[in-house]
Swiss-Prot record:
Keywords: Aminoacyl-tRNA synthetase, ATP-binding, Cytoplasm, Ligase, Nucleotide-binding, Protein biosynthesis. This is Glutamate--tRNA ligase 2. Catalyzes the attachment of glutamate to tRNA(Glu) in a two-step reaction: glutamate is first activated by ATP to form Glu-AMP and then transferred to the acceptor end of tRNA(Glu). Pfam families: Anticodon_2, tRNA-synt_1c. SUPFAM superfamilies: An anticodon-binding domain of class I aminoacyl-tRNA synthetases, Nucleotidylyl transferase. Its main location: cytoplasm. The keyword Magnesium does not apply. GO terms for cellular component: cytosol.
Amino acid sequence: MHEKLTTRFAPSPTGYLHIGGLRTALYNYLYARKNGGNFLLRIEDTDLKRNSKEATKAIIEAFKWCGLEHDGEVTYQSERFDLYKEYVKKLLDEGKAYYCYMSKEELEELRAKQEAAKERPRYDGRYREFTGTPPQGIEPVVRIKAPQSGEIVFKDGVKGEVRFKAEDIMDDFIIARSDGTPTYNFTVVIDDALMGVSDVIRGDDHLSNTPKQIVLYEALGFKIPKFFHVAMIHGEDGKKLSKRHGATDVMEYKEMGILPQALLNFLVRLGWSHGDDEVFSLEDLKKLFDPYHINKSASCYNAKKLEWLNAHYIKTLPFEEINRQLKDLGFDLSVYEKAGFLLDLLRERAKTLHDIINGAKSIVNAPQNYDENAVQKFINKNNLELLQAFANTLKDQKTGKDFEDFTNDFLEKKEAKLKDLAQPIRIALTGSAVSPSIFEVLEFLEVDECKKRIENFLKVRGK
């Protein structure tokens, strides 16, 4: 029925999309695209008390920002409760599941006895073969008849052969709560099977769920998918990645001025590699990615590597793409004259899009204030006089090369060096001692504007 390789990403909308979740989504997306398959998005929103519409919206926005296009409509588990109830009934009718009338007090008493005997807490199966009259006042749960002995074995695409002893890890676990709502493992199996999911790539925090899900696949007569359990992302201190290591919400990276191309490139390398290559476009990855080559061990988050990749993409992406991302941050470079030249001025040194935004503002807008530390460090009576003479002799220079040649000739005549003039020019033109090449800034602003800014600076400094 389902011939295509099909993967899925299935987040719970109880919080915003974590970068670990985005990496999982990316791996599933790439594997599907490489094989001409389907990549599905399912929102696991059965926990009606904890669900957040804002979180659901943020997940979908993050997908859109990153360019991960899913196939078909988004599936919402909250719209499928009737379907889950049908399959609970099927298992009950076939004798593969049963009603359990154990009260809360009985369960607590059982756990206390097991703890006293230093046994693993587990349900004891007392209602497994129950045929009597149900106790009054108890809303039953539904439990699956799980195997009580033997092994559950599966081949994991990352970890290799994985074995679980049934008696060590499993009791007759609940598939429907007393209010009729289905449990996580049950809904996952129903949805993956009915949506035709052939390959499940997910974090290895789900590894312990897998034997329970295999029991359900077998009880329901569904084909078991291939599993790939990916190790967690750790911080540079070797501990599980958390907010203390930096941003974890995907959309925080957008606000920080990180490009989606850089973030995806960064994340794919946290657990997967292709030789010594570091830079991959999404199109490259659709051809190269192979989940069987995912590392078994945890990967380490490296903020410097992300910064390096972001700088690379700022340098190399076309103007239209950079400006599209800038617009999402509320800044449109295209409103300026010579916008392409302005971007080229700024992109060589920029590490984030905010460097582009701040740099553009400092060049395009005449400074209202001057960096006092820079003024104290670089400005003195001698170079103010040199700056005045420089402005007075500027005439008809056009290109950066024109300005460079003119400046060198000017300095030679004045028996001065570039270090005596470059920073005063930079401060006068931009208000700061940090900017792109001073000759390119002169070219961008042109002679009249340069003269005006230098004169204004000299006036402010009391010259």
